[in-house]
């Protein structure tokens, strides 16, 4: 049974996480994968999300996968209570997850009933295909994909993050307009999160956030 917390910007909806996790997140071990942000010029969100996890009492372990052995990665994910995949370039993230076999490790983690947290690219990556995110992220960051954008296929919808948020508002709106007729699009702003708990799928909004 899938248990997913899929945000546009985790730190803005972190207040909703304890209830979703059964008010049992303090002391939990979180594997934090920041790989999507490696080629980005702006990365403040990585530190903000990590700080939000720690503020909730979780123990955060950085797992930057590009230079780690498969054995190290597999061991860390196997021992983790939660896996967190941060934002950045979704195409680069898919390329590196696929190259290291971490896509399958994450799927196994989810299939074992363990909780997954995504933020922006980390949420979008769970779709069947991420080609729809082409206006938001540069394809040039992931030449090894060779046009194959098949992703983790954990959910049957496609998340468009940052719907009302600068500087992505117009790009997000363009993406929704172009693909909503052919894909199951779920667009969220930074103050919203899509939660999946088995068959239940719901969009929640954090109070006091925009």
Model-identified regions with their sequence ranges:
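Short glycine-rich anion-binding loops that position phosphate/pyrophosphate groups of nucleotides
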Residues: 36-38, 88-91, 121-122, 164
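Short, well-ordered alpha-helix to beta-strand connector turns
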Residues: 57, 80, 113, 155-156, ...
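N-terminal beta1-alpha1 cap of cysteine-dependent amidohydrolase-like domains
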Residues: 1-82, 86
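Patatin-like phospholipase A catalytic core
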Residues: 8-9, 192-193, 197-210
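Short, active-site-adjacent cap segments at secondary-structure transitions
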Residues: 91, 123-126, 193-195
């Amino acid at each position: 049974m899938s248990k997913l917390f899929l945000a546009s910007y985790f730190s803005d909806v972190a207040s909703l996480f304890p209830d979703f996790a059964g008010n049992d997140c303090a002391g939990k071990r979180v594997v934090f994968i920041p790989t999507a942000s490696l080629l980005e010029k702006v990365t403040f969100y990585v530190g903000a999300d990590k700080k939000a996890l720690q503020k909730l009492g979780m123990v955060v372990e950085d797992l930057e996968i590009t230079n780690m052995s498969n054995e190290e990665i597999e061991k860390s994910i196997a021992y983790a209570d939660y896996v967190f995949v941060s934002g950045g370039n979704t195409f680069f993230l898919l390329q590196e997850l696929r190259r290291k076999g971490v896509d399958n490790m994450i799927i196994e983690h989810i299939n074992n009933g363990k909780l997954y947290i995504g933020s922006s690219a980390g949420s979008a990556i769970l779709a069947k295909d991420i080609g729809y995110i082409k206006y938001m992220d540069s394809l040039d960051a992931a030449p090894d994909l060779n046009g194959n954008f098949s992703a983790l296929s954990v959910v049957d919808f496609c998340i468009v993050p940052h719907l009302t948020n600068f500087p992505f508002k117009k790009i997000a709106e363009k993406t929704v307009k172009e693909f909503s007729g052919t894909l199951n699009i779920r667009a969220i702003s930074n103050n919203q999160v899509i939660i999946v708990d088995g068959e239940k799928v719901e969009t929640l909004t954090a109070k006091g956030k925009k």
